């Protein structure tokens, strides 16, 4: 007994739609990882920060930096070594840092006037 072609095509279409939506191996925007869960890249986490532990090779979802905490804006293989700052803070680097070295800064709150000065001068 042979299935009609249109029924076979319909079955294949539903099968591929299932694979594209629910059969996905990476988390979707509705299936993001929570804090302290193991992650592979920043996009997997709710916070947007997948941080690699300095003492081992494990990485986990971490909170973004609060005022005074260590921060970094460079991404290494889809992960941070220190999470970037929260939305209302800026990562400020020391002036004596080398350009090519791995630079860590501190999260600080900056007034709008200082930002405007930095942008134009």
From Swiss-Prot:
It is found in: Secreted. The gene is CLPSL1. Gene3D superfamilies: Lipase, subunit A. Disulfide bonds join 39-50, 45-61, 49-83, 71-91, 85-107. Exclusively expressed in epididymis, in the corpus region. This is Colipase-like protein 1. Keywords: Disulfide bond, Secreted, Signal. Belongs to the colipase family. One of its GO terms (biological process) is digestion. Its main location: secreted. InterPro entries: Colipase. GO terms for cellular component: extracellular region. Residues 1-23 form the signal peptide. The keyword Disulfide bond applies. One of its GO terms (molecular function) is enzyme activator activity. PROSITE patterns: COLIPASE_2.
């Amino acid at each position: 007994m042979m299935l009609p072609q249109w029924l076979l095509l319909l079955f294949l279409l539903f099968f591929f739609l299932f694979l594209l939506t629910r059969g996905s191996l990476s988390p979707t925007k509705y299936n993001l990882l929570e804090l302290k869960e193991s992650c592979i890249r920043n996009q997997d986490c709710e916070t947007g920060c997948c941080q690699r532990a300095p003492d081992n090779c494990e990485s986990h979802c971490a909170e973004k930096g609060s005022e005074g905490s260590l921060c970094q804006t460079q991404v290494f293989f889809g992960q941070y070594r220190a999470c970037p700052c929260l939305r209302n803070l800026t990562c400020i680097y020391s002036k004596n840092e080398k350009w090519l070295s791995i630079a860590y800064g501190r999260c600080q709150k900056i007034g709008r006037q200082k930002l405007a000065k930095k942008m134009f001068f």
